[in-house]
Amino acid sequence: MSNLGFKKGDKVVIVGGGFAGLQLARTLIKADLKVILVDKQNHHQFQPLFYQIASGRLEPSSISFPFRKIFQRSKSVDFRMADITNILPDERKIMTAYDRTINYDHLIIATGCRTNFFGNKELSENCFSMKTTQESIDIRNKILFSFEKEIFARPEEKQAWMNIVIVGGGPTGVELSGAFAELKKDVLPKDYHNIDFSKFNIILCEGSKNTLNNMSEESKVSSRKYLEDMSVIVKTETILVSYDGNEAVLNNGEHIPTKNVIWAAGVTGNIIKGLADDDVIRNRYIVDRLNRLKRFDNIYALGDVAYMETPLYPNGHPQVANVAINQAKNLGKNILKSLKDDKSEAIDYEYHDLGMMATIGKHKAVVELPFIKLKGAIAWYIWMFLHLMLILSVRNKLVIFFNWAWSYLTKDTSLRIITNIDYKKEKVISLK
């Protein structure tokens, strides 16, 4: 189909300001459309660096970009801060959490993923997840505050504050484990002279046989070796069965006393109520090669929340940033073609895998590009360069580069700030 039905002056509502939603809004910034970008947060969050917020490497503002700042010079793109709770397709409206509606001519759903605890309520209530900037800050606060609590804890309680369990051996879990390991080695002993950090255990649990299980065998082996060289305890073929806030129970019967469990073991599509069950598979909207929902001619889904079958990917695309960004670019091109009444065929989306990468620590990284596989220092520099280039503003690029350079030269960071502690709730400084 050559024309998607977009007309000049149409109201296009994009729900979600992640990689896909933001990319589409920027693609349409000069189009003759009325574009409304809606998100629960007032800022775009650069998720690949959440772990550096959690480990005190970067300040939150360096990876957070206010939407109104991004589009302050645009006359066609506006922003609304709202949590969308329902889609009313027959009325062409979406409902917000405070019972207000937003009308649309065309709806693009780019709501990304949420943490998947696989229905385990106990884990969802007691584990930390890391899907927002605020959750990353919460992890930083809790981990740093644990050492303050350890000082006042009874002897039999101390080890629980010194064990961190990270569940999930994908890039997030591996990178977070490595970041905490560097803190353990280079930073924390200088801050806490009366704590024996040889008892500080970083325990990474992965359900499959390997860390970075979606990468090559060489990267799997290298990532585990890097982690174990940094004194991370790696437990593969290990599943967290239960966690009550005090003790983690593993599927091998092991019981680990811990006050800190971070869940990085899975995500699921963040769908919105209102569409039929037939429109969804595994919490992702079923779309055609143009990212359009099959039962609608004016509703689209992008990125992690879109399920598109292609000959190369019969089970849908991986839920990674590259897919989200390029689906948004492709849809943007097709929308612009439609506005010009271009009679040529709309462009089907085709995913081109650009590779995977993960960093474990200083000079310890693995990079897999379509034409080469790398590890060690050169991979680490490539990882830093590529992530730095993805940061939106020049100012933030400079801030992040300065922080990385300072950390590289001094093996230290000045961002170990604990905020928003409720002393009554925590019952922290008790000498009883």
Predicted segments with their positions:
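Short, well-ordered coil/turn residues at beta-beta hairpins
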Residues: 97, 110-111, 238, 251, ...
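Beta1-alpha1 glycine-rich phosphate/pyrophosphate-binding loop at the start
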Residues: 2-80, 85, 171-214, 262
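C-terminal, flexible cofactor-proximal segment of oxidoreductases
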Residues: 9, 332-432
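FAD-binding core/adjacent interface of flavoenzyme oxidoreductases
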Residues: 1-11, 77-165, 262
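A Rossmann-like FAD-binding core segment of flavoenzymes
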Residues: 75-87, 181-289, 295
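FAD-site-proximal beta/loop scaffold in flavoenzymes
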Residues: 125-157, 246-247, 255-326
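Short hydrophobic core segments
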Residues: 13-15, 103-112, 240, 256-266, ...
